[in-house]
């Protein structure tokens, strides 16, 4: 999502923290931030940036707390078999290194194993849940997968040039990048020309960011500018687009409501879900998955795990643009998509109408509806009002779906124990009518901690068991953990 931001001037460099060396340590594991975890002889934990499991290393401590220390790697005396040479010259643990990736020095298979362990640990320690089965990890291309990104921009007067890219590690400064191995190759090839473009503009000192959004055939770049663009600057943007086929410039002078195409065009951003005959138009301000290759597999697996039958009604909670809703509609009798944003609901309805017009999917999409509702203020009464559905697909933001599952658990307790539900105002026994809880829930998560918390609600008090869980490597080389879990009603 594009936000209204103004990049501040980088702060004055802080005094270098006092460092002191520590003796040889054996790294035991990695934390979620890809820091090696070791223990001193007295049991104190040391987090070591750049170190990998089973390596013997020395390090310099730069932060000392009563229960742990943080350190930077200085030497490796026994190297891990999983250590690899980073593909990108801008990756590293040194000052000035790009902070966009954290794990390029670790083999991709080992990265996935780390994320799987993070998911299992979160389920065990936060949710007190153990999945009956582990799903095979969903994996895709390791490089040039990132179709959405926010590129920071800063013009450096002393150097007479603009920097365009991600921030440096643990810094507000923009990394001095000339290439990037996670964005599409054609975008990486544009980084140096983009630096030249920004440097040539009259507004070069008041452009804080460029938002990148790639579709299957087009690339959109949203230029955030803090002062009006001159006629000459507009001409420079148009010339740059003309020299880079498939590039659309969008401009943003203020909040989200100011984002607009520089020049009206017939072509629009879209991505496809070919297995379901679905094409999803979107705007650069819409939320879409960063990795389109993984998204196709994710949607396919979610529907397969849900096991939707032609006679069933399905609810897609946090439906967004309809990424899951429209494919579900090709399998189910009826689908209800629910989203908290009126804007996204309007966009999902547009996508529904566009795809309904396609003859090969039209019959299955006739019974699809979308509604807007604040899903972070759900109550049992609201849940009953939405009607019964045999299956649920839940794909929340990082905050998770706690209120939704708390309401579901409250209804379960009313049925099982007769304890009245809290409808958000007072306790009352709700008239359930024909309402019944879903027999199966597939939960897609971008935050393993909130997934684990919500899983605990379902398993402890909602009448479900977790039959399967696994990771989705949506963001290779980063510490981000995407995952999914399946819940069956007991």
UniProtKB/Swiss-Prot annotation:
MF GO annotations: 4 iron, 4 sulfur cluster binding; iron ion binding; RNA binding; rRNA (uridine-C5-)-methyltransferase activity
A single GO BP: rRNA base methylation
Alphabetic keyword roster: 4Fe-4S, Iron, Iron-sulfur, Metal-binding, Methyltransferase, rRNA processing, S-adenosyl-L-methionine, Transferase
Entry keyword annotation includes Membrane: no
Highest rank taxon of the organism: Bacteria
Stretches assigned to the TRAM domain: 14-75
Residues the record lists as binding S-adenosyl-L-methionine: 289, 318, 323, 339, 374, 395
PROSITE patterns the record matches: SAM_MT_RNA_M5U (PS51687), TRMA_2 (PS01231)
Enzyme class, first EC level, given as a word: transferase
Pfam families (alphabetical): tRNA_U5-meth_tr
EC number: 2.1.1.190
Residues reported to bind [4Fe-4S] cluster: 88, 98, 101, 180
Active-site annotation: 446
Catalyzed reactions: uridine(1939) in 23S rRNA + S-adenosyl-L-methionine = 5-methyluridine(1939) in 23S rRNA + S-adenosyl-L-homocysteine + H(+)
InterPro entries assigned to the protein according to its UniProt record, in alphabetical order: 23S_rRNA_MeTrfase_RlmD, MeTrfase_TrmA_CS, NA-bd_OB-fold, SAM-dependent_MTases_sf, U5_MeTrfase_fam
Function in brief: Catalyzes the formation of 5-methyl-uridine at position 1939 (m5U1939) in 23S rRNA.
UniProt similarity note: Belongs to the class I-like SAM-binding methyltransferase superfamily. RNA M5U methyltransferase family. RlmD subfamily.
PANTHER family linked: 23S RRNA (URACIL(1939)-C(5))-METHYLTRANSFERASE RLMD, RNA M5U METHYLTRANSFERASE
Protein name: 23S rRNA (uracil(1939)-C(5))-methyltransferase RlmD
Species whose genome carries this gene: Polaromonas naphthalenivorans (strain CJ2)
């Amino acid at each position: 999502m594009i936000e209204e931001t103004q990049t501040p001037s980088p702060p004055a460099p802080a005094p270098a923290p006092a460092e002191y060396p520590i003796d040889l340590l054996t790294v035991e594991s990695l934390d979620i931030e890809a820091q090696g975890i070791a223990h001193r002889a007295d049991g104190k934990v040391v987090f070591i940036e750049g170190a990998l499991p089973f390596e013997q290393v020395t390090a310099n401590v730069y932060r000392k707390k009563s229960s742990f220390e943080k350190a930077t790697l200085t030497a490796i005396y026994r190297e891990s078999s999983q250590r690899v040479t980073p593909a990108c010259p801008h990756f590293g643990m040194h000052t000035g290194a790009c902070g966009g990736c954290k794990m390029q020095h670790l083999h991709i298979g080992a990265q996935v194993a780390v994320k799987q362990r993070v998911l299992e640990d979160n389920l065990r320690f936060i949710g007190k849940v153990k999945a009956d089965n582990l799903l095979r990890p969903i994996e895709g291309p390791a490089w040039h997968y990132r179709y959405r990104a926010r590129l920071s921009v800063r013009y450096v007067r002393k150097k007479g040039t603009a920097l365009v890219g991600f921030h440096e590690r643990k810094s507000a400064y923009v990394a001095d990048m000339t290439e990037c191995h996670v964005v599409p190759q054609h975008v990486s090839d544009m980084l140096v020309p983009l630096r030249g473009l920004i440097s040539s503009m009259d507004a070069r000192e008041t452009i804080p960011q460029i938002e990148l959004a790639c579709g299957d055939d087009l690339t959109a770049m949203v230029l955030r500018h803090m002062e009006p663009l001159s006629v000459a600057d507009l001409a420079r943007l148009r010339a740059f687009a003309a020299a880079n086929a498939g590039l659309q410039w969008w401009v943003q002078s203020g909040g989200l409501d100011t984002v607009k195409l520089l020049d009206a065009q017939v072509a629009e951003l879209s991505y496809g879900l070919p297995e379901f005959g679905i094409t999803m138009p979107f705007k650069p301000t819409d939320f879409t998955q960063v990795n389109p290759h993984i998204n196709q597999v994710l949607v396919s697996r979610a529907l397969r795990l849900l096991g939707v039958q032609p006679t069933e009604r399905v609810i897609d909670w946090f439906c967004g643009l309809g990424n899951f809703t429209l494919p579900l509609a090709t399998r189910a009798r009826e689908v209800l998509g629910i989203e908290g944003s009126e804007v996204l609901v309007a966009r999902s309805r547009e996508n529904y109408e566009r795809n309904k017009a396609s003859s090969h999917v039209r019959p299955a999409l006739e019974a699809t509806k979308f509604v807007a509702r604040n899903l972070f203020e759900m109550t049992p009464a609201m849940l009953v009002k939405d009607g019964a559905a045999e299956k649920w697909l839940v794909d929340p933001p990082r905050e998770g779906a706690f209120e939704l599952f708390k309401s579901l658990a409250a209804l379960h307790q009313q049925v099982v124990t007769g304890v009245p539900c809290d409808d958000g105002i007072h306790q009352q026994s709700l008239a359930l009518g024909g309402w019944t809880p879903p027999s199966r829930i597939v939960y897609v998560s971008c935050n393993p901690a909130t997934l684990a918390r919500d899983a605990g609600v379902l398993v402890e008090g909602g009448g479900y068991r977790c039959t399967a869980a696994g990771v989705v490597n949506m963001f290779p080389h980063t510490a981000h953990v995407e995952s999914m879990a399946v819940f069956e009603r007991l």
